[in-house]
Amino acid sequence: MAAPWVLPAPLSPAQLKRLEQHRYSSAGRSLLEPWLQPYWGWLVERLPPWLAPNAITLGGLLLNCLTALPLIASCPTATEQAPFWAYILGALGLFIYQSLDAIDGKQARRTNSSSPLGELFDHGCDSISTVFVVLGSCIAIRLGTNPDWLFFCCFVGLFMFYSAHWQTYVSGILRFGKVDVTEVQIAITMLLLVSAFCGTAVWDYKVHLVGLELKFFAVVGILCGTAVSCFNYFRIIFGGGVGKNGSTIAVAHMTKSEISLQDTAFIGPGLLFLDQYFNSFIDEYVVLWIALFISLFDMLRYATGVCLQIAAHLHIHVFRISSHQAPEQVQNHND
């Protein structure tokens, strides 16, 4: 058996017991969803019945990350012009990820393999993918020319993801707005295609009527969407993450338990804070790499520990459809 610091068991017996009572519940329908449902239905019918939903989710995440990496590597400051194929690859990877993310739940219901582990796996992968999607969109419109806006757009995506699951933690229902994640992913796919065929310089074109570059219209759209979504989320939160944080709040909601204030996820940011506090006595670039590896290791060990622990408790497999499956756990908004 692996040491606890390598492969922890984050959930208590009481949390695992409450996990059995969890039922996924969602409400709302976004604008594009009715139009995409036939495509998603057709796509899921092409999948073999032995393919596990979690394998679909993980495959989509890996594809999205791998297709975004060439774009990130080509544009380290989000001001460069990447090769044509990098934008096409990023757009294709994001579209495929969106498609797979939409059908993993359908495959679970189709094969009678729905479980709390599948919901957690889906949200956990989304929390990681959010980082790459946001970076891809910022690179597509060359937002690195305005570092303040780049910083804002990167973190507003993570904040909105966390807030969506925060209101789910409070209300027990994952709510979808008219403009939600599907619309955002399709819009970013279009941004990548425009940058591929027109070049990123097109986003620097200034609209003389208002004196603003085209890229700022995208930022204004983000601002408006954020304001509306925040109003809807916090109206529920006050009335009642991302990365590991996004997974942690999903686990807390599903196990009906409190979120721990002490978390090893704070080690990486803590190192960066201390290095700044002591006037960068260690090179910032070195500390950033150290924080990255610590955070990556911490996220992987937490996610692996939770998935294996839940799978063992429910007597199911993570990446295989088991002969014994948990009872139906889904109350969906769009089926």
UniProtKB/Swiss-Prot annotation:
Name of protein: Cholinephosphotransferase 1
Keyword Manganese: yes
Pfam families xref list: CDP-OH_P_transf (PF01066)
Superkingdom of the organism of origin: Eukaryota
GO cellular component terms attached to this protein's record: endoplasmic reticulum membrane; Golgi apparatus; Golgi membrane
EC code(s) of this entry: 2.7.8.2
Membrane topology qualifier: Multi-pass membrane protein
Protein residues bound to Mg(2+) 1: 101, 104, 122
Source organism of this protein record: Gallus gallus
Residue spans crossing the bilayer: 53-73, 84-108, 116-140, 151-169, 181-197, 213-238, 267-276, 284-313
Site (Increases basicity of active site His) residue list: 119
